[in-house]
């Protein structure tokens, strides 16, 4: 229950009414109710007109006077600045009420005409005002979101710039290492070519020595035949001659043996140097493989960076489309500042999208260059591996030939018949040191099967589609 105080005041019209102007204060009955405020409510004025045949009864129990019949009462509810609700009851006669109603109708008709001329339909204006208020609230919220997002994007772009600088320095270091590797590979190629030439020269020398050995064996056989034929005629002369010939032959054999031992040592040194060069080439190939793996990892990092940049670019494009759609809508004169802010934000977004496109294009160029360098290095490494395998095959072939010559010499010395003349046959061999079998099997082909050209094609196709 609300506690209220009420007062009733009755007025009677005393003045004469002029024609054409209704009297507003005749037979007025005021009822004032003061109600304590429940909640702060905006000031509103509502007018209720009720037609009553009987006098009203107050709810607070006070005695009221009998009001005259045929009077229309109006109740007005208002609130004063002191946050108190008041109710005032006014009373009019029927003629006054009709005049008031006609006057109100005329005023409403004129106001409706003026409103239609100025603003058009009132309902449409209310809807437009509501829509504009909603758009303003949404635009303020979007502006706050865009400001925060733009700050985050600015920090992200700064981090991207720092990463781009680090990647540029890394690419410069990689280019330097690539130049060093290419120089080392060319030096190794020259060394292998020189080794191949020395191998060919040593093979020629070995063939010449083999021919000399065959000629010496033929001379030895001729001498034996002569000795056998001349033993019966003159044994002593033949012995002297055979001694002289044997001494000469022995000197020649010793000299040939010394030369052969020297050449054998030279060949052993050359083979050792070949093996060392092959080991160094294997080590360099392993280092090149490690550098290729590092480059693959860096290419993967660049790919991930490019994907993040493309996602960022897509988000910025979506924001730009939202700004453009918002700018393309109808805006009132009060939204010019908002329109200018949207234009500035869209221009900054376009600039950032252009900057991201340039960065993505630059990173794609770097990835393509690194991929081409990796492919060229792979081809060079494969060529070096083929050369090393060919050299190892030649070494094994030389070892087989040497073993075959040694076995032939052993066979000839064993099957040669002994004569009465005491002679010594010295077998001259040119055996090379057997190379360890593990060295020839240590060379393995590179296990990399990653070809980043497919990734470059995917990136280029994505860029053309966007």
UniProtKB/Swiss-Prot annotation:
It is a peripheral membrane protein. It comes from Mus musculus. It comes from the Eukaryota. InterPro entries: Tuftelin_GRINL1A/MYZAP/CCD68 (IPR051375). Residues 45-55 have a biased composition (Basic and acidic residues). Residues 1-68 are annotated as: Disordered. Its main location: cytoplasm. Residues 95-137, 187-415 form a coiled coil. This is Myocardial zonula adherens protein. The keyword Cell membrane applies. Interacts with DSP, MPRIP and TJP1/ZO1. Interaction with MPRIP inhibits the activation of transcription factor SRF. Interacts with GRIN1. Interacts with DYNLL1. Residues 1-16 form the signal peptide. Belongs to the MYZAP family. Residues 1-10 have a biased composition (Polar residues). It is found in: Cytoplasm, Cytoskeleton; Cell membrane; Cytoplasm, Myofibril, Sarcomere, I band; Cytoplasm, Myofibril, Sarcomere, Z line.
